[in-house]
């Protein structure tokens, strides 16, 4: 019997494991960047709307002195990367597609938010403000030595970078396989995510679209494709925005008697984007009563 493990999405990189034998079919994501691909993102978003939603985003209006790049989180880059994931904002009816877009934007906005309660323009205008985690976190290596297939490199730091704030050596290694066709590039150079806007956005969409057992993909959750099993139901894991939070940061933000303020902002971001796209937020927005996946 064969089991299928997704290394990337949409058959771009697959690993089949059968009777102890492994065969890889790899077509690196970066080789699929063309202008001929299409994405539904442009159906619901324009550059003008992007500027309205993210007026404080990293690098807008100025050139990053380190990377020599203006507007790191540009709408153009987001659309270009979305074309690599043709099922993103493409399955179900318009309401489901807009709900997925709202859920994705809510999570990346909160992951990178520079806002505070009385921030100019309001808290929700400060999404995509940060490129990397705050300085207090960048002293941690985020190297999980139990993940033997993706060994971290001494002196390298796998802290959060990019829209999703990709973290941990095993995530860098898996995404490196999907993007470059090998795990070593980003394990050796995790800082690349802070230098290349395409790579940075791709890391976020790769994470969103890719299931990592025992977690389903955020994409499958929000479009209603993921069906909880009996244990999921017992543990409170139900379809909805809350389960995407569980996938992203369940060990910290879920199953808490009192939600952290950042978790409340994450839920509120989702409602903010749903309102912007004129759709309902659906059921099970919170993960407060959900056990993290794997527990």
Task: Enumerate the language-model features and the residues they cover.
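Hydrophobic, mid-to-C-terminal alpha-helical segments
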Residues: 218-219, 229, 233-247, 255-266
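GST-like fold's C-terminal all-alpha helical module
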Residues: 206-228, 240-241
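Short, well-ordered loop/turn and helix-capping segments at boundaries between secondary-structure elements
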Residues: 172, 210-214, 276-279
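Surface-exposed patches in mature extracellular/periplasmic domains of secreted proteins
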Residues: 87-101, 117-121, 215-225, 281-287
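Peptidoglycan-targeting cell-wall enzymes and recognition modules
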Residues: 25-80, 89-93, 100-210, 236-240, ...
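Low-complexity, Gly/Ser/Thr/Pro-rich intrinsically disordered linker/tail segments
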Residues: 246-295
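Bacterial Sec-dependent N-terminal signal peptides
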Residues: 1-22
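Amphipathic alpha-helical surface "interface" segments used
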Residues: 222-237, 288-295
């Amino acid at each position: 019997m064969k089991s299928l493990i997704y290394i990337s999405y949409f058959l771009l990189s697959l690993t089949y494991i059968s009777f102890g034998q492994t065969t890889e079919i790899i077509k690196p994501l970066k080789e699929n960047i063309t202008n001929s691909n299409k994405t539904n993102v442009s159906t619901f978003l324009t550059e003008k709307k992007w500027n309205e939603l993210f007026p404080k985003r990293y690098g807008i209006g100025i050139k990053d002195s380190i990377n020599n790049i203006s507007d790191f989180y540009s709408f153009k880059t987001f659309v270009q990367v979305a074309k690599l994931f043709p099922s993103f904002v493409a399955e179900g009816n318009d309401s489901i597609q807009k709900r997925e877009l709202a859920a994705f934007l809510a999570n990346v906005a909160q992951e990178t938010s520079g806002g505070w309660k009385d921030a100019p323009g309001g808290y929700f205008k400060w999404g995509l403000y940060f490129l990397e985690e705050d300085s207090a976190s960048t002293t941690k290596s985020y190297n999980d030595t139990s993940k033997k297939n993706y060994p971290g490199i001494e002196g390298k730091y796998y802290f959060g970078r990019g829209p999703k704030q990709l973290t941990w050596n095993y995530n860098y290694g898996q995404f490196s396989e999907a993007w470059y066709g090998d795990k070593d590039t980003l394990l050796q150079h995790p800082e690349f995510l802070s230098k290349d806007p395409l790579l940075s956005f791709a890391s976020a969409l790769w994470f969103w679209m890719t299931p990592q057992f025992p977690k389903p993909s955020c994409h499958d959750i929000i479009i209603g494709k993921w069906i909880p099993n009996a244990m999921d139901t017992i543990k409170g894991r139900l379809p909805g925005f809350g389960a995407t939070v569980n996938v992203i940061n369940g060990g910290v933000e879920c199953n808490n008697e009192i939600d952290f303020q950042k978790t409340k902002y994450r839920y509120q971001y989702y409602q903010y984007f749903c309102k912007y796209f004129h759709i309902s937020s659906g059921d099970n927005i919170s993960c407060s009563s959900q056990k993290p996946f794997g527990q």
